Amino acid sequence: MAGPTRTKKSRTKPLKRPESRTSELAGATALVTGGSRGLGRAIAEALAKEGCRVIIAGRDEQALDVVSATISRAGGSAYVRHCDVRNEKSVDALASAIHKQFGRLDILVNNAGIAHVTATVDQLSTEAWREVLDTNLTGMFLVTRAMLPMMHSGATIINNLSISAKTVFPGMAAYNASKHGALGLTDTLREELRPRGIRVISLVPGATDTEIWQQFWPDAPREKMMSPASIATVVIAALKMPGSATVSELEITPTGGSL
């Protein structure tokens, strides 16, 4: 269960202003859940480079502090917030803190996610099933619902679904189900929020050199995988599209083909 929550700016003093202060995204307020490592970290750093005020949220506060310090050294603005997306009170506290400090949210990146050691359905524990679904699907729902009152026309939601939203990996029933469910939630949000001028984008990356891939496929050829930074570059490009247009889905695969 989540511990005490707090909002803070990195203790590291910025050394310089971001080079991209003229970016279309400069001054936007962005929240990245699961921002302490992997793809979440890469997206948070890319947003900060564009001049966004980035809130990075997650359970590993020490790791979040490292990301915040890295962003600050590069001249960006990062704010750390402890949050367990499975816990409704923790999510509501996060929303309250963002509203109090910034008053609005322009970009929401739902990136928090976990996976468990592979197990066939007949060997999968109820506890493991619930933990994955609660994090990857219910967590996305709780965060989005809590943040929507602060999001207005021109805002964007990006949900990281992973390639498991489009295919299945045997032995990963909970993860597959959570991502397929997240795809359905994302598609629903897109239609519900279209009249409000809020864009909703599905992020569907293939093999990316992140902790989850390293954990479950340690022998996979890393040289054929995409880097988190390359995915973040595509995300930034989508965010910079004119408000009158949107990319509904970003399905990104390695140039070298399947592993």
Q: Where are the regions that the model predicts?
A:
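Conserved glycine-rich cofactor-binding loop
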Residues: 29, 36-37
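Conserved glycine-rich Rossmann-like NAD(P)H-binding loop of the short-chain dehydrogenase/reductase
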Residues: 50-67
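The beta1-alpha1 cofactor-binding region of Rossmann-like NAD(H)/NADP(H)-dependent oxidoreductases
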Residues: 61-62, 82-94, 126
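Substrate-binding pocket helix/loop in short-chain dehydrogenase/reductase
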Residues: 119-121, 125-130
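Active-site helix of classical SDR
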Residues: 144, 178
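Residue(s) in the substrate-gating loop at a strand-loop-helix junction
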Residues: 162
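C-terminal helical subdomain
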Residues: 202-203, 218-259
